[in-house]
Structures are given as structure tokens and as C-alpha cells.
């Protein structure tokens, strides 16, 4: 039986090997990505039974996405190849650390998710449904899909996890806040970053007041993370790594925290696992290539007290 289901738009990323403007590049590496895809792959590598709901185009990039997810052991019962194209994006890293992303996803097969896109009984017995704020930003249909999926999860006693994952290229702060206001009553576990809190609400404190959920996890980058649970704040320290490619690190963080929750770990150890996964992905090229397997965890945590038993 599945433990986690994620849903969203798969993407393919084209990434230069060295910093500099894309216009001067001749070789680009190809990676499979997308926020919910990254979460699914990271969970599968940890041995969590995970399913992915989504659409890709009837094209070679869609075939690439499907092959990757199957190879990683993600359940694809409600994954479909559909008319249209698979979303694509290009990343550009400049020498002083700035980065830009160029999306080619509007009207993609993956952005056409709508209510009824999967049999809601697929959620029976699942521990978590995980969504991100990217999916509802893609289209009115995808926004309705996100709310519908959350409602179906709640009907079946499934906890809903939502990563704010705000993208200012997809929608405005006002639109994002409007969606969050509608979604929050059904959210059990909320992830957001300090940067997102400030962009959407002006101050972190205001965001935490507005975004009340039973469990809120604030990602603080190199400063680690805070989890607000049962009226207390739990702090988790970051792992010091040299960031090679930060894209996907937040998704890996969410996957680590979710895995810890599925395993019944205390909040402190969920944060530790989340920070470890985020650091591992940030230290590697690609959206999820650096996500560790469960058998790697004890080695990676050897420098500190490990929770593996």
C-alpha cells in the first residue's frame, strides 16, 4: 500500500555545465525535474512507497520523464501521456552566484490537470498527499485540481502536505495568498521558506500568523529550519556543504521531513533528515540526482548521532 502520493507537473531541465550566459553555451545537460517529481524520487530512494499523479506530453521528453520515474520505483498508476508537449526549463548561473530560470511550460500537458484527473480511491490508506504551490499557479484548472485533491484526501483521512513553493513568474503575491487562504483549512503540514514568507506577507512573523496549520516548517537556508508543532518551536541545524546546484534542495528537504513523519520519527529527527536531504541535493548537479538512498543515511550522518536503528 502506498504511503505518500504527490501530484503536479513534471519538467525537463536543460542546465549548462559552467556558469555564464546561456547564449554562449554549446553543451547543456538534461535532467528530469519538477517540484513534486523531485519529492517523489527522494521519497522512493528512502524506501517510502510513493505514487505520482501527473501528465506529460506524447513526446520524447515525456518518455524520458516516465522512464526515470519507473526506474526510481515510483508508482505511476495515475501517470498519463497526453496530447501536447512536456514542460521544459533552462537554468542559467552567472559567475557571482546569481541565477535565472527560463520556462517553456505554458499550455503544457502537465499544466492541464483538472478535478477528476485520477480516481480518488487511489488515496485510500495513504499517509500523506503532498502538493506544492506551483501546481495551482499553472492554470485555473490546475488550481481547481489542487483544491479537489485536498478535499478527496481529507474525506479519506489522509493528511495533506503543502509546500508553498512560490514562483513569482507564475502568479502574483495576491493570487498566491488568495489560494493559500482557501487551501489552509485542509492543510495538516505546511512548508515555506523565509524568503517566501517575506515576499508574500512582508515579514516572517506575519506569515506565521496568517499561515496557521497544525504543523508548519519554516526553511531558513544555511540557518537550518524551524518546525512549529503543538505550540512549540523546534530548531534544526543546517549541514554545511558547498552548494553546486540549489534547485531541488527545498523539495528534497520536504521529502526528508515527510519520510521522517511516515517513519514516526520525533520532530527533531525529521528536521535533521530534512536538512540532510536538502544539503545532499544542493551539493550535486540536477534537481534530485543527489538525493540519498536509505542505506546511505547512516554513513552520511556518521559525524553526528544517527537515528537509524
Swiss-Prot record:
ATP binds at residues 165-167, 193, 219-225, 248-251, 275. The lineage of its organism: Bacteria, Thermotogati, Deinococcota, Deinococci, Thermales. GO terms for molecular function: 2-dehydro-3-deoxygluconokinase activity; ATP binding; nucleotide binding. GO terms for biological process: phosphorylation. SUPFAM superfamilies: Ribokinase-like. It catalyses: 2-dehydro-3-deoxy-D-gluconate + ATP = 2-dehydro-3-deoxy-6-phospho-D-gluconate + ADP + H(+). It holds the Pfam family PfkB. Pathway: Carbohydrate acid metabolism; 2-dehydro-3-deoxy-D-gluconate degradation; D-glyceraldehyde 3-phosphate and pyruvate from 2-dehydro-3-deoxy-D-gluconate: step 1/2. InterPro entries: Carb_kinase_PfkB-like, Carboh/pur_kinase_PfkB_CS, PfkB_dom, Ribo/fructo_kinase, Ribokinase-like. Substrate binds at residues 34-38, 89, 103-105, 167, 251, 287. This is 2-dehydro-3-deoxygluconokinase. Keywords: ATP-binding, Carbohydrate metabolism, Kinase, Nucleotide-binding, Plasmid, Transferase. Homohexamer; trimer of dimers. Optimum pH is between 6 and 9. Involved in the degradation of glucose via the semi-phosphorylative Entner-Doudoroff pathway. Catalyzes the phosphorylation of 2-keto-3-deoxygluconate (KDG) to produce 2-keto-3-deoxy-6-phosphogluconate (KDPG). The active site is at residue 251. It comes from the Bacteria. The keyword ATP-binding applies. Belongs to the carbohydrate kinase pfkB family. Its EC number is 2.7.1.45.
Amino acid at each position: 500500500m502506498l504511503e505518500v502520493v504527490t501530484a503536479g507537473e513534471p519538467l525537463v531541465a536543460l542546465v549548462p555545465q559552467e556558469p555564464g550566459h546561456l547564449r554562449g553555451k554549446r553543451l547543456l545537460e538534461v535532467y528530469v525535474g519538477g517540484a513534486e517529481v523531485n519529492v517523489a524520487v527522494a521519497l522512493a530512494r528512502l524506501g517510502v512507497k510513493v505514487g505520482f499523479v501527473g501528465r506529460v506530453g506524447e513526446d520524447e521528453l515525456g518518455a524520458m520523464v516516465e522512464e526515470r520515474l519507473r526506474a526510481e520505483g515510483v508508482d505511476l498508476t495515475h501517470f498519463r501521456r497526453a496530447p501536447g508537449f512536456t514542460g521544459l526549463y533552462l537554468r542559467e548561473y552567472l559567475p557571482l552566484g546569481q541565477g535565472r530560470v527560463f520556462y517553456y511550460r505554458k499550455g503544457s500537458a502537465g499544466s492541464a490537470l483538472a478535478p477528476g484527473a485520477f480516481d480518488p480511491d487511489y488515496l485510500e490508506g495513504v499517509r500523506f498527499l503532498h502538493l506544492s504551490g506551483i501546481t495551482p499557479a499553472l492554470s485555473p484548472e490546475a488550481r481547481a485540481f489542487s483544491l479537489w485533491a485536498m478535499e478527496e484526501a481529507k474525506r479519506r483521512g489522509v493528511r495533506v502536505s503543502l509546500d508553498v513553493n512560490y514562483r513569482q513568474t507564475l502568479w502574483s503575491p495576491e493570487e498566491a495568498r488568495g489560494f493559500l487562504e482557501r487551501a489552509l483549512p485542509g492543510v495538516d503540514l505546511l512548508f515555506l521558506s523565509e524568503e517566501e514568507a517575506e515576499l508574500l506577507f512582508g515579514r516572517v512573523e506575519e506569515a506565521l500568523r496568517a499561515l496557521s496549520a497544525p504543523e508548519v516548517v519554516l526553511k531558513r537556508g544555511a540557518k537550518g529550519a524551524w518546525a512549529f508543532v503543538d505550540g512549540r518551536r523546534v530548531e534544526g541545524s543546517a549541514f554545511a556543504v558547498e552548494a553546486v546546484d540549489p534547485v531541488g534542495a527545498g523539495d528534497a528537504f520536504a521529502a526528508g521531513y515527510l519520510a521522517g513523519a511516515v517513519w514516526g520519527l520525533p520532530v527533531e529527527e525529521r528536521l535533521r533528515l530534512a536538512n540532510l536531504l536538502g544539503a545532499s541535493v544542493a551539493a550535486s548537479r540536477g534537481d534530485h540526482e543527489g538525493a540519498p538512498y536509505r542505506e546511505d543515511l547512516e554513513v552520511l550522518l556518521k559525524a553526528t548521532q544517527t537515528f537509524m536503528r
